[in-house]
Design a protein with these regions (language model features):
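Positively charged, low-complexity terminal tracts
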Residues: 1-82, 86-94
Length: 94
């Protein structure tokens, strides 16, 4: 487990292949409860290449000096990401 926010990643390997490749991350909040949004790609075994960009929001809780995952929300497509952005922009304008 990670001891600092900088160590948190969603990269993971299976059989020597980086199945989930983190492209970027933005820390949305820090503290005992931290929220991070990640941009990543998943390995497509059939095509033997990485798929389109995906996004996930993860919540971590720091307990006993280590960050532990507490929740996640996966954004399934660029279209869904745009709809989330539009909804938030609409609410923030009010």
């Amino acid at each position: 487990m990670a001891e600092t926010i900088d160590e948190l990643t969603i990269n993971w390997e299976e059989d020597g292949v980086l199945v989930c490749k983190e492209i970027d991350k933005v820390v949305l909040s820090k503290g005992a409860w931290s929220t991070i949004i990640f941009r990543y790609q998943q390995w497509d075994k059939k095509k033997e290449e990485y798929g389109p960009d995906r996004y996930t929001i993860r919540r971590y809780r720091k307990m006993s000096g280590e960050y532990k995952p507490q929740g996640k929300f996966n954004i399934s497509s660029a279209d869904q990401a745009r709809k989330i952005i539009a909804a938030l922009e609409g609410w923030l304008e009010k």
